[in-house]
A protein has these predicted regions:
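N-terminal pre-catalytic "stem/leader" segment of glycosyltransferase-like enzymes
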Residues: 1-57
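Nucleotide-sugar-dependent
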Residues: 171, 215, 219-222, 227-250, ...
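Conserved catalytic-core segment of nucleotide-activated headgroup transferases in glycan assembly
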Residues: 10-25, 143-147, 154-223
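Active-site proximal beta-strand in glycosyltransferases
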Residues: 58, 74-91
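A short, well-ordered alpha-helix in the C-terminal region of glycosyltransferases
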Residues: 288, 295-310, 316-322
């Protein structure tokens, strides 16, 4: 089996966690893999469409082609597998109106043209089913060998609230600015650590700004004491696949999150972390964890057990391989 995997970037989270980390497993099971960035220039596109027939499967991660390119893709590709992990059929949370007919139309066309679709969660799967019944959920996962439980016994004089992500999501965290100020007033030994490529400041709580680096992200996560994942309740957030939470729980952190979409499945309220809907709940739940290190450890260990139950490369890679084999067998 020869498979071409198209990704949006080598450092893009979806590329790393939904494609690149599966390549070694696929290769070890006989799949001849080629990974490439989406073509941009005219020359790259000509070469891309020229090469397509040599592959048994073309695996597209997230990006939707416009109608002319999609027609060419369907003519030249033997089999198409489309993978996505966001509400790409809607506008993001910053938009006044989440509905976009252009996005919806392009998404529908992409789904119709695909032989199989892999969705990152059940909400996304349900967007596919009316158009294409050949769809399964594979959650965004982590490598359980790379993500090890943090050392709870390391002495620390500060409690670290942590958030990891990219510039497109930090606005969710920044909206909690007043909460962080109140937390800082109550707990002088508390800090907020942001691992990202952009940052913001607070006056009453120390903000530790750490530039994200792929080879340091696990160590950064292990330095957190409490993981945060705020969201808003909208169609864009419903499509999120909870990678932050999976990362937090993978290293044994308790999580405080907005109970929206997949967050409700990943965080068991009162067991692996807390749900927080209002500013008062956010402040209260964070405070409870700041004051109770034993509760942090208990919830963190329980969260890791949950992740090991189905959100690892070790459990998801065989499922991806099985899908590729089934797609091969159909044609």
């Amino acid at each position: 089996m020869k498979a071409l995997f198209l990704i949006q970037g080598w450092e893009v989270a979806a590329s790393r966690y939904r494609v690149l980390q599966y390549i070694p497993y696929l290769k070890s099971h006989g799949v001849e893999t080629t990974v490439s960035l989406y073509p941009r220039s005219i020359k790259e596109n000509i070469q891309f469409f020229s090469d397509l027939p040599q592959y048994d499967i073309v695996f597209l991660q997230r990006k939707r082609f416009n109608q002319p390119r999609l027609r060419w893709l369907r003519r030249r590709a033997r089999r198409i597998v489309y993978d996505f992990d966001d509400s790409v059929m809607y506008r993001n949370s910053k938009a006044k109106d989440p509905v976009s007919q252009t996005r919806k139309r392009r998404f529908t066309q992409m789904i119709k043209a695909s032989d199989f679709v892999i969705a990152g969660n059940e909400f996304l799967r349900d967007q596919v089913l009316p158009v294409n019944p050949n769809v399964e959920v594979i959650p965004t996962s982590i490598d359980q060998e790379r993500y090890q439980t943090k050392d709870y016994l390391v002495p620390k004089d500060r409690v670290t609230l942590g958030w990891i992500g990219d510039h497109g999501s930090i606005h969710y965290l920044e909206k909690m600015h007043p909460i962080f100020e109140r937390i800082g007033e109550r707990y002088s030994h508390c800090e907020l650590k942001i691992v990202c490529d952009i940052f913001f400041d607070c006056e009453k709580i120390q903000v530790v700004k750490k530039q994200w680096k792929s080879d340091e992200e696990v160590e950064d996560l292990q330095g957190f004491d409490i993981g945060l994942m705020p969201l808003v309740d909208d169609p864009w957030s419903w499509g999120k696949c909870g990678l932050k939470i999976v990362q937090y729980q993978g290293v044994g952190l308790p999580v405080v999150c907005t109970p929206v979409g997949v967050n409700r499945d990943l965080v068991v309220d009162g067991a692996t972390g807390f749900w927080a809907r209002t500013p008062e709940e956010w402040e209260g739940k964070i405070s409870e964890l700041i004051e109770n290190p034993l509760l942090r450890e208990r919830m963190g260990r329980e969260g890791r057990r949950k992740v090991l139950g189905g959100y690892t490369v070790q459990s998801c890679a065989p499922r991806l391989f099985s899908i590729l084999k089934r797609v091969m067998d159909k044609k």
